[in-house]
Amino acid sequence: MKTLTRKLSRTAITLVLVILAFIAIFRAWVYYTESPWTRDARFSADVVAIAPDVAGLITHVNVHDNQLVKKDQVLFTIDQPRYQKALAEAEADVAYYQVLAQEKRQEAGRRNRLGVQAMSREEIDQANNVLQTVLHQLAKAQATRDLAKLDLERTVIRAPADGWVTNLNVYAGEFITRGSTAVALVKKNSFYVQAYMEETKLEGVRPGYRAEITPLGSNRVLKGTVDSVAAGVTNASSTSDAKGMATIDSNLEWVRLAQRVPVRIRLDEQQGNLWPAGTTATVVITGKQDRDASQDSFFRKLAHRLREFG
């Protein structure tokens, strides 16, 4: 009898342990697959592609790669003597047409005062037409001068905002064309996190919800707030042929891959360039309030850590 009782006890204990293990595994699976989190997240920032509005030889480069610069700080300078001469030529044209316009204005005024008693109407009209032509030429010369002045100002390339110079690929002596990107500027205090959440987890993602961001390779947890959720993503399964007809890719009905939707997360505190734009992180959406880690059970703490590996 004792032997039977002992066997039943062992069987019951084993069964209970198996059931508990199954429950733990099931809860872990649900927590892992359905709670709003993703390892596919990246730090991002506002980046300005700086390109000159004038062409010419680069005479000075005043910064080095990855340097922190202030707004309006000079980055590099393009061939100023050429544009200074162009401005001087334009100013000379303006001065010439100003003198010529004054002469033609006096001539037209004199003929208009004398009237048809001293000369023909044709001569009077001709003087007025010449004056109008010279005034138009003066206006054109003034516009050319203003453009030359603007070009001269734009030979000095300045930082549009505080930030870090990155991917600097210009050097003194090189010729740069108008509109060609010379350097990128990563704006200071513009960093945010772009999390690519699976569509099956969007139910737990809303603007204003709190988020935890763990950079890859770091134990530090940053705090943030969901700023916005993308309103749409590209449908890669549908395209159009040459005649505009829809082309739909074949899918296996029993295999459905969840689409990923960009979610923008605003950081509570800017971290400088400690985690550069493009680096990866794990994001967990905790809901309307921050998660109190001190109140988490061992199971939840373990689950949070396992997210870093899967």
UniProtKB/Swiss-Prot annotation:
One biological process term in Gene Ontology: transmembrane transport
Q: Indicate where this protein resides in the cell.
A: Cell inner membrane
Q: How does it sit in the membrane?
A: Single-pass membrane protein
Q: What InterPro entries has UniProt attached to this entry?
A: CusB-like_dom_1, CusB_D23, MFP_Efflux_Pump, PHBA_efflux_pump_AaeA, RND_pump_MFP
The record's annotation in Gene3D superfamilies points to: 2.40.30.170, 2.40.50.100
Entry keyword annotation includes tRNA processing = no
GO CC, sorted alphabetically, is: plasma membrane
Asked if the keyword Membrane belongs to this entry, the reply reads yes
Query: What are the GO MF terms of this UniProt record?
Result: transmembrane transporter activity
* UniProt-listed Pfam families: CusB_dom_1, HlyD_D23
Supply the alphabetized keyword list: Cell inner membrane, Cell membrane, Membrane, Transmembrane, Transmembrane helix, Transport
- Where is it mainly found? membrane
Query: Function of this protein?
Result: Forms an efflux pump with AaeB.
Q: PANTHER family in the record, alphabetically?
A: P-HYDROXYBENZOIC ACID EFFLUX PUMP SUBUNIT AAEA, P-HYDROXYBENZOIC ACID EFFLUX PUMP SUBUNIT AAEA-RELATED
The similarity comment for this entry is: Belongs to the membrane fusion protein (MFP) (TC 8.A.1) family.
Q: What is this protein called?
A: p-hydroxybenzoic acid efflux pump subunit AaeA
- The species is Salmonella typhimurium (strain LT2 / SGSC1412 / ATCC 700720)
